[in-house]
Amino acid sequence: MKNKIHFCLVLTALILVVSSCSKKDRPSLADYPKDADPHFPLYPGGPLKFYTAFNGTSTDKLMNAVDSVRANFPTNNPLASATGITGSGIKGDGVKAIKYPSANDFNLSTSCTISMWVNNTVNPNTELYFSLVSKDYWHESSAFLLVEHAAVDKCTFKFALQDHWVEYTNQSFTKPLFNGNWHHLAFTYDETTSLLKVYFDGVEVPTPGTSGNLGLGKLNLKSSTNLVVGGWNKHADISGPTDAWISAYTGKMDQFRLYGKALSASEVLALYNSKL
C-alpha cells in the first residue's frame, strides 16, 4: 500500500511538472491592453474579433503586438514601437511586416469593419497597409489596402475585399492622409446591402461610381489564414505577389481592429472621437 501511495504521489508531481513546462509563458489577462471603447466589451466571440493596441512596453516585440481579444501573439514582429494616437503604436520600415497566425474568428464574419489609425508623410512608394491572407485569389489576399502616388492632400487609394475593389484612381482620394498627422481609417461592409463604406477621420468618403456596391451578400472569408499588419504577404514571408514595386507601410500605425459587423456611422465616429 505504501508503495502504491508513493507511486501515485510521484506520478502526480511528474504530471504537474510536464504540464507547467508545456505552456507558453504569458502574462495574466490583466496585463493585456484593455479596450476603452464602451460600445463593444472585449470578449472572445463578441463583435470585436481582433484588436491590437500596440501598447506593450516589454522588450519582447511579440508581447507588444499581442491581440487583446484572444491573446493571439504574432509569430513575428520586426517593427519598432513608436508614439501612437493612444499610448504606443508601431513604425513601419517599408520592408517587413507583422505576421499573425490568424485573425482569430474574423474569418467567420459575414459583415465586417476594418479600422486603424495611421500617420505618414509623402513618399514615392506603393505601400500595403495590411493583408488577410487567402489562397482563393490570384494575389492570395481576401482583404488589403494599397496606397500610392501620395501627395500631402491626395493619393491613389485602393481597398479590396474578396477581390472586389474600391479604387480612388488618379489621386482622387482627396484627403490629407500624408500630412504627418494621425488619421483614422475605417472600412465597413454590410451583408444586407452589399455596400462597402469608407471613412476618413470619422466621416464617410463617397466611393467612386457604383464601386461601393460589391454585390457579395454574405462575406465568405473562411479560407483566410494569416493576418499581416504593416505590409503585404511578401513582407511577412508568405506566398503572394513579389513584384519589386510592392512596398510595406512606412508610417506609424495604431489601434488595429477587426469587427464581425458593419459599424454604424455613429460608431465609427465614436472611434475617431475617442482616438480608438
Residue map of PLM features:
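Extracytoplasmic low-complexity segments
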Residues: 21-94, 269-276
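Short tryptophan-centered beta-strand motifs in secreted/extracellular beta-sheet-rich domains
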Residues: 116, 180-189, 198
